Amino acid sequence: MLSPKRTKFRKAHKGRIKGVTKGGSALNFGAYGLKALEPERITARQIEAARRALTRHMKRQGRVWIRIFPDLPVSSKPAEVRMGSGKGAPEFWTARVAPGRILFEVDGVAEEIARHGFALAAAKLPIKTKFISRIGDI
């Protein structure tokens, strides 16, 4: 799964995802893409599950680009622990995704295969998404 090799700080504030994405809203690598329509934190496990669903449907043809990276640590306290005594240990990594962000891109496959593959990948993600292509948003 994806995670940073090293970070400046071990723990991070929760924060909020406001407005639409600043960058990463256009296709840069592939012919087809999956665009986020809602703000959400997406975990490294969800990214990996979506990637697996997509690559298995494509039968390892073509190329897949993951355009988001989980660089935000999410901490949690163990079960049945009293409040206080500091912030919990980092449990998993997430990526902050704003509306309009491209999540995945593919190239080298037919549009129908890409469209169905993205539908399978989108089922693994906690947000609404949209299929886009270089020809025009469909």
UniProtKB/Swiss-Prot annotation:
Its GO CC terms are: cytosolic large ribosomal subunit
Instruction: Give the keywords, sorted.
Output: Ribonucleoprotein, Ribosomal protein, RNA-binding, rRNA-binding, tRNA-binding
| InterPro entries, A to Z | Ribosomal_uL16, Ribosomal_uL16_bact-type, Ribosomal_uL16_CS, Ribosomal_uL16_dom, Ribosomal_uL16_sf
BP GO annotations: translation
Enumerate the Gene3D superfamilies for this protein: Ribosomal protein L10e/L16 (3.90.1170.10)
Pfam annotation, one family? Ribosomal_L16
Q: Which GO terms describe its molecular function?
A: rRNA binding; structural constituent of ribosome; tRNA binding
Q: Which SUPFAM superfamilies match?
A: Ribosomal protein L16p/L10e
Query: Which domain of life does this protein belong to?
Result: Bacteria
Q: Which family does it belong to?
A: Belongs to the universal ribosomal protein uL16 family.
Summarizing the function annotation, the protein's role is: Binds 23S rRNA and is also seen to make contacts with the A and possibly P site tRNAs.
Subunit and interaction comment: Part of the 50S ribosomal subunit.
The protein depicted here goes by the name Large ribosomal subunit protein uL16
Protein's organism: Paramagnetospirillum magneticum (strain ATCC 700264 / AMB-1)
